[in-house]
Regions:
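Bacterial N-terminal signal peptides that target proteins for export
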Residues: 2-14
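C-terminal segment of classical bacterial N-terminal signal peptides
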Residues: 17-27
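A generic secondary-structure boundary signal that marks alpha-helix termini
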Residues: 20, 61, 148-152
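Glycine-rich catalytic cores of cysteine/serine-nucleophile enzymes that process amide/ester linkages
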Residues: 30-103
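Activation targets extended, charge/polar-rich intrinsically disordered C-terminal tails
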Residues: 32, 119-187
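Second-shell loop/turn segments in exported
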Residues: 39-43, 101-110, 125-133
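A structural motif
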Residues: 107-120
Length: 187
């Protein structure tokens, strides 16, 4: 028994709509968020003020989940830090500490930029010799380089080189397009 004309037209329209959805439906573009954090320091826990970056998201090309963080510091904290370059390391924060830090702002980057930023992390990790310098290559300079790769304006005023929160607040003010607000408190 032939299908009534109305049902044939309806079935054809439904098939066309479904086909167009299949053709135009694309997977959501995966991105990695890069958050810029500062830690105020804690006399109780023996921690100095610090700044670091957190990468979270999914790579578009592979679907790989990303959840990692990196900061730059001296391998050992001794008075030698005050007199010039010392041995360095990339510091990875424990997850329990990240929630207790200040998240200043977040950038969203594509796979290519994520790879550039990670290459920069590895360049600092594998720099030869004594690479950490309290006044010239500390955690602020490391995070600043990551921010610059992300297209942000960065500077390093001498009076902020040992004040990560204040320095990230300055980066926030230099980049109003972020829509971020300064984080208050001492440091």
């Amino acid at each position: 028994m032939p299908m009534p004309r109305f049902f044939r037209s309806f079935a054809l329209c439904l098939a066309l709509v479904c086909a167009s959805l299949l053709v135009t439906a694309q997977p959501a573009e995966a991105k990695v968020k890069v958050s810029f954090h500062s830690f105020n320091g804690s006399v109780v826990f023996g921690r100095y003020p610090h700044t670091f970056v957190v990468f979270e998201g999914t790579l578009d090309e592979t679907g790989q989940a990303i959840n990692e963080n990196f900061g730059f510091t001296a391998k050992t904290v001794t008075p030698a830090i005050l007199s010039g370059p010392v041995a360095h390391m990339i510091w990875v924060e424990e997850p329990k500490w990240i929630g207790k830090t200040n998240r200043h702002f977040t950038l969203t980057v594509d796979d290519a930029m994520y790879r550039k930023m990670r290459a920069e992390v590895e360049a600092w990790r594998n720099a030869p010799g004594k690479y950490y310098d309290l006044d010239n290559r500390n955690c602020i300079h490391f995070v600043g380089k990551i921010a610059q790769l992300g297209g942000l304006k960065v500077d390093y005023p001498k009076d902020l080189l040992r004040k990560p929160r204040s320095w990230l607040n300055r980066v926030t003010s230099l980049n109003p397009q972020l829509g971020a607000k300064a984080i208050g408190g001492k440091n």
